[in-house]
Every structure is written in C-alpha cells, then in structure tokens.
C-alpha cells in the first residue's frame, strides 16, 4: 500500500503548521476581519459609510500537477487550474470573483511558454467572470531548473454581508449535493506520481490504460472545473447554507469546513459515479477507501449544503448549467467530521 505520506506529503504536519501560523496571523487582525485562518476564503468587512459588502480573498497554486505539464511540455491548461483553485475557494462564501492576479516563478524565462501559461489563466478568468488585472513573473536561475516553474494566484471577490455563507444556518436534516469534478483537479499529484512511477519513467504518461479512453497524461492534465457561474445561478434562486471545495485533504478535511461544530456529514458511497481515474489510482496504490477520500475528490469537486425543500431546484439549475449533481448525503448531529457509509 502506497499512502500520501509515503509520497512525501505529511498532511498532519501541514495541520500543525496551520495551527502555528494561526496565532501569528491573528496578531495582525483588526475588527474588520470576519473569518478565522482556515476558512476557504478570507472575509474582510468594507468598513466604509453606507457599505454592506464584504471582500473575500483567496490564494492558491497548482502544486505538483505542474510536474505533469513539464513532462508533457503542455502548459496551456495549468492556468485554468490556478484560477479554479482560488475562485472556487472564495465561492464557498458566496462571493462573486472580481479580479485575479498571477505569480509565475521560473528558472529561465521563455516568453512563449509564459504567454501560453497566462493564456490559460485568462481563459480561467473568463470562465469565472473575473478580470486578470496583473501579476508577477520572476526569473530565478539556480533556484528552479531551467524548464521548470511554479504558478500561483490570488483572487478577490465581493458578497453582500447578509448573503455571506459561513455555514451558520446548517441544521440537522440538511442535504449534501455533490457537484461532479472533471478528474483529479489539482490535488493528490505527489501520490499519483509515486503510484505510477512518473518521475522515474515519464513515458508512462503516454500510456492509454484500459480504464481510460485517453492517455494517462491527458487525463491528469484535465483542468480543474470552475463552479462559479453555475453556483451563483443557484444562489439567485435558493439559499445555500454551506459550500465546500473538495481540494487537499479530500472529503474529510474540506466538508467539515462548511458547517459548525455539533454536526457530522454522513456521505452515502455509491450515490455518484467515481471516475475511472480514481479506480485506477486505487488499484495501483492498494490504499483503502478512507485514504482515497482523504486525498482525492473522488469525482465530487464541490459540495453544497441545502434544505430538503431546495434540493430539486438546485439540481435543476445545475443541470441546466451543464453540471452533473448528486444527492450524496445528509447533515446529522454528531461530533463533527465526515462519516462514509
């Protein structure tokens, strides 16, 4: 069995680092900071006369998915991933993204490659309905290899104070709606690379596995789905009580961030189609379901928490917007966390 920790990613150490950072960051907070460190997005009250809006910001990167782009020399979609990771996070608080900035650091600046990357960023911004207003490109020889780069971004959005989503209205009996993912998205790639031996043999990315209808590399580079416009459409019609973006830490880490203490999310396995890529990863890694659900999105890229009466309306809108959705579980009273059944 090959776990995420075996691949070099220690999630527990990450949690420890966040807890240490929290206290440092809190020393800088003023009275306009609404959310604690660890929320999907950071909420800041616009404390100006006659304003009832909150700024919501988020920052993230593409992670080691970039290694796949390096090996395949394909750089046109990782920019979409970068935007998705940021705007999907601030969407969890009901915010409409306003603008985006990117940061590219590379070993050797190659203008055409950078332009290709940024074209993907711009495409992501178009999908999300926000503006790419600036960024930074840093050439750092001796720090990165010549053919390698890192890509991160920063998004800012806006939500009316009385419409901000923080999970405060979640109650027992509420329903969890899962929104279909487009594949692995942008998390779990350290484990993926280890499981398939990609770093030792990059040519494996050209292999077409029986479970997939395209090469492994093409499957792994599918861009992260951006949920902004479909979810904002749902918000026009119903109240969404909580939203979770399923990223690093999978179901177990992210779904509990969408509701307060005293509840547990009960997930019914088998209520949606787990994508073939995840079956393939599990086959080769030999890890159990809990490890898979704590590492990957398993075919669900975002989870909405709504009242029973609003489920049908929400799913109809999502279907109209081209997003497959599933009732995947319920909210029950409990000690917190996620239970898989």
UniProtKB/Swiss-Prot annotation:
Q: Which gene encodes it?
A: purM
The reply to whether Ligase figures as a keyword in the UniProt entry is: yes
Q: Which GO terms describe its biological process?
A: 'de novo' IMP biosynthetic process; adenine biosynthetic process
Q: What is this protein called?
A: Phosphoribosylformylglycinamidine cyclo-ligase
EC number, as in UniProt: 6.3.3.1
Q: Please provide, alphabetically and separated by semicolons, the GO molecular function terms listed in this UniProt record.
A: ATP binding; phosphoribosylamine-glycine ligase activity; phosphoribosylformylglycinamidine cyclo-ligase activity
Keyword annotations of the record: ATP-binding, Cytoplasm, Ligase, Nucleotide-binding, Purine biosynthesis
| Localization terms from the record | Cytoplasm
> Which InterPro entries would you find in this protein's record?
PurM-like_C_dom, PurM-like_C_sf, PurM-like_N, PurM-like_N_sf, PurM_cligase
Question: Which Gene3D superfamilies does this UniProt record tie to the protein?
Answer: PurM-like C-terminal domain, PurM-like, N-terminal domain
Q: Which pathway does it serve? A: Purine metabolism; IMP biosynthesis via de novo pathway; 5-amino-1-(5-phospho-D-ribosyl)imidazole from N(2)-formyl-N(1)-(5-phospho-D-ribosyl)glycinamide: step 2/2
Primary subcellular site in the record, as a coarse category: cytoplasm
Q: Cellular component per GO?
A: cytosol
UniProt family annotation: Belongs to the AIR synthase family.
Reaction equations catalysed: 2-formamido-N(1)-(5-O-phospho-beta-D-ribosyl)acetamidine + ATP = 5-amino-1-(5-phospho-beta-D-ribosyl)imidazole + ADP + phosphate + H(+)
Keyword Transmembrane annotated: no
Organism of origin is Caldicellulosiruptor saccharolyticus (strain ATCC 43494 / DSM 8903 / Tp8T 6331)
